[in-house]
Amino acid sequence: MKPEILKLIRSKLDLTQKQASEIIEVSDKTWQQWESGKTEMHPAYYSFLQEKLKDKINFEELSAQKTLQKKIFDKYNQNQITKNAEELAEITHIEERKDAYSSDFKFIDLFSGIGGIRQSFEVNGGKCVFSSEIDPFAKFTYYTNFGVVPFGDITKVEATTIPQHDILCAGFPCQPFSHIGKREGFEHPTQGTMFHEIVRIIETKKTPVLFLENVPGLINHDDGNTLKVIIETLEDMGYKVHHTVLDASHFGIPQKRKRFYLVAFLNQNIHFEFPKPPMISKDIGEVLESDVTGYSISEHLQKSYLFKKDDGKPSLIDKNTTGAVKTLVSTYHKIQRLTGTFVKDGETGIRLLTTNECKAIMGFPKDFVIPVSRTQMYRQMGNSVVVPVVTKIAEQISLALKTVNQQSPQENFELELV
């Protein structure tokens, strides 16, 4: 049996490799070897699997659908990517850049995480020509979905080696800056921060457009000094800066998630407006799955931790729950009383959100693959952008660039085509 079929079965039922292996009473290591192609699943085991899952999966349709599924990149596994990240980054980026000429614009993806920003800009006609991410598990998810292994520590990447691009995208960490200011003889106040790495690149590449994402706390971070330094730095470099805060729940996502967004253009004549939230609401109950197994919270943990009388209580939801849930955080798997949202379902009556439910409240497509452990999945989803919001911003950026080119063909904003 081909590995792709086994992956498809797990994806449809939202099972881990261990859960899938338990269905036919083999070790998770055996299942892992089947999926990786190291060994082949015996037909008898596949027949046993069909018998066990006949009420949940139409295997004839499954075989027919296989060719219609999104491509899953699996030439390299997690271990190979962890050990040989930079070498594989070089190899996969060379392949990626071959068809960059056919795109509307080219962009780079810094602090890329699992690729939420990339997903958003690609659907608007962009082509990614460089990506960077330090976390090995996020790299694996990124590779599985896009076929590219991101480069590692951006501080070790020479700016001159980064390809020319039209848009720099970055969901950078929020860090305080020096209060010394730009006095002669002193370092720039951004020195030693990840924003400084962005500055270093755009100084070298003269990047025409920037898209930056951060937590809304950036606005008041360090008594407003952080945002002040960012804007002053970009304006001193000739950029026209726009920024705002948008809430995902206003874009048809059942999650209250506010984020800070900044868009900047070197061309001062470009007119840009952030997307007006369509104010489309979606109830969390609409995306919840039924009869879920494997995500339950033990009764002991419920009694001894979740519902202690002297402490706060978690938010419990079900299919009848309206409105949006609290912000999904990267530490969701730690089952936090005050910030956690849990579902009234499962073997013990209360469970965690499933992989598919997390994808839904972050706006990822259903076929986006999460090849890592559940703990890593929660971390990755909690650290990601909400795809539909960024997609709308990317659409506005693309529209602004096209409009200025049409209006001023002689003195237009030339996109790099190298």
Swiss-Prot record:
Alphabetical list of PANTHER family matching this protein: TRNA (CYTOSINE(38)-C(5))-METHYLTRANSFERASE
Taxonomic source organism: Moraxella sp
Protein EC: 2.1.1.37
Family under the similarity heading: Belongs to the class I-like SAM-binding methyltransferase superfamily. C5-methyltransferase family.
Annotated catalysed reactions: a 2'-deoxycytidine in DNA + S-adenosyl-L-methionine = a 5-methyl-2'-deoxycytidine in DNA + S-adenosyl-L-homocysteine + H(+)
GO MF terms held by the record: DNA (cytosine-5-)-methyltransferase activity; DNA binding
GO biological process entries: DNA restriction-modification system; methylation
Active site location: 174
Record keyword S-adenosyl-L-methionine present: yes
Superkingdom to which the source organism belongs: Bacteria
Keywords annotated in UniProt: DNA-binding, Methyltransferase, Restriction system, S-adenosyl-L-methionine, Transferase
Domain SAM-dependent MTase C5-type: 105-404
Gene: mspIM
Gene3D superfamilies to which the protein is assigned, alphabetical: DNA Methylase, subunit A, domain 2, lambda repressor-like DNA-binding domains, Vaccinia Virus protein VP39
Name the record gives this protein: Type II methyltransferase M.MspI
SUPFAM superfamilies: lambda repressor-like DNA-binding domains, S-adenosyl-L-methionine-dependent methyltransferases
